[in-house]
Amino acid sequence: MSEVEIYSQLSNSLSTTALFGIMWAFLLWVAGRSASVAIESDAGIVMKIAVTVFGLVSLFQFNLSASYVRFGFETAAHSLAVLKESGADLSARALSSIEAMNGSTDVPQFSLMPEPVSYTHLRAHET
């Protein structure tokens, strides 16, 4: 896989993840509105349980989409590090991406714990 293909795959992954993130953020808002309506209208216990389950599922899925952002960056850094180790010439941007995203030849592991602090760190290195 070439450097351009790695960046293209990262771009596609981030675009798709952003769409899912926006959708789940909206559904999380809907869950919040549904909860407030259920509380204000003195809804039954079944409705409150259904709204709570819907809200928890929406929150989990939103967190999952945020976790895929980090995983996408780690996977791209891993692919660039493997490309570098294979002897291919990389651009200065690719080398700085490997450094900024802690790229290594070890395969990244998916984690459900997104790191918002690392997002700001990555954004600072983009400029």
Located regions from the model:
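Helix N-terminus capping/helix-initiation residues
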Residues: 44, 115-119
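Membrane-interface segments at the starts/ends of alpha-helical transmembrane spans
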Residues: 3-12, 102-116
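Cytosolic-side membrane-entry/anchor segment at the start of a transmembrane helix
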Residues: 1-32
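Inner-leaflet juxtamembrane helices
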Residues: 47-89
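Membrane-interface helix-boundary motifs at transmembrane edges
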Residues: 35-44
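Conserved small/polar residues in nucleotide/adenosyl-binding loops
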Residues: 120-127
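Hydrophobic alpha-helical transmembrane segments of multipass integral membrane proteins
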Residues: 20-27, 52-62, 122
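Short membrane-interface loop/juxtamembrane segments of multi-pass integral membrane proteins
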Residues: 82-113
